[in-house]
Design a protein with these regions (language model features):
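A cross-kingdom feature strongest in bacterial/archaeal respiratory oxidoreductases
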Residues: 1-55, 84-275
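Non-catalytic, well-ordered alpha-helical segments in soluble enzyme domains
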Residues: 59-86
């Protein structure tokens, strides 16, 4: 952000990104917003707010309407106008179509818009899918140099940090590791033995010029030569709930390797920590 004269952050939380920007626009929580959506099977639904926006925040569609210079900038009006201009609420199975207002009220009352269009899923090409996965695995192994380790990033139960200040989500154990209020460097037993570490040991993970430290957890099923790290912990701007929970793995990520990087270096740094 240092090379950009004006930076604006839009969101419903004051976090590290907003702290790095010159301006912060208050975004409304999803439970404060009007909107619409389509389920995987084609079912359409109108999203209704549970409460009025507490801090006069804007939803995404309201911000876009404002930036685009639209005359209508209220969430309710935007959603209603969208469906009024489309055929979504004007089509009924009966010969006599009721007016839009009746269809709109019915959609709000029922929660879904009927009749729902049927979406046909494209057939799955099993052979092509297997070939793609095999190619990706082979490429990953080819990228892995001697002595390097593949570092994988996982959003985890905190959804990458969006829920890190929610005590209920922190208390929810990870379904694989059973950890709560903490993250770890997940590693296979074979790879751990090769590096002379075990569960509870503190190690450093280096990618490029950035290094982070974390606690090892030997995890059955973890691929040899790889480590996995849950994101969303060790935040610098977290709020009192998330403070002190785990370590921050985000410094290791780059825009071209957001989820996996085969060029990692792992080293024991001494010391132990209870997970």
């Amino acid at each position: 952000t240092a090379r950009v004269p004006n930076t604006v952050h839009f969101g419903d939380q004051d976090d590290e990104s907003s702290a790095a920007c010159k301006w912060h626009l208050v975004g409304a929580h999803p439970l404060e917003c009007w909107g619409d959506g389509r389920a995987w099977n084609g079912t359409l639904s109108i999203q209704q707010p549970m409460i009025r926006a507490l801090w006069n925040g804007m939803s995404v569609i309201e911000l876009l309407a404002l930036v685009a210079g639209e005359e209508t900038t209220g969430g309710f009006e935007i959603v209603r106008r969208t469906w009024e201009e489309s055929t979504g609420l004007a089509m009924t199975p009966s010969d006599q179509e009721p007016p839009f207002d009746a269809n709109w009220r019915k959609a709000l009352h029922d929660g879904v818009i009927e009749p729902a269009p049927v979406l046909e899923s494209p057939p799955l090409d099993v052979a092509a899918t297997i070939a793609m996965l095999t190619s990706a695995s082979t490429q990953s192994e080819a990228d892995l140099k001697a002595g390097d380790i593949e570092v994988n990033f996982v959003p985890g139960t905190l959804l990458g940090g969006r829920m890190s200040n929610n005590g209920w989500m922190q208390e929810l154990p990870d379904p694989i590791t059973k950890l709560a209020w903490d993250n770890a460097v997940l590693i296979s037993e074979k790879t751990a033995n090769e590096h002379g570490v075990t569960t509870g040991d503190i190690v450093s993970i280096t990618l490029g010029k950035n290094t982070v430290k974390g606690t090892v957890l030997v995890q059955p099923g973890q691929a040899v030569g790889t480590v996995s790290i849950m994101l969303g912990y060790g935040r610098d701007w977290p709020g009192r709930v998330a403070s002190g929970a785990g370590f921050n793995a985000y410094p290791l990520r780059t825009s071209d390797r957001l989820w996996s990087n085969p060029a990692g270096k792992l080293a024991a740094v001494g010391g132990t920590e209870q997970l």
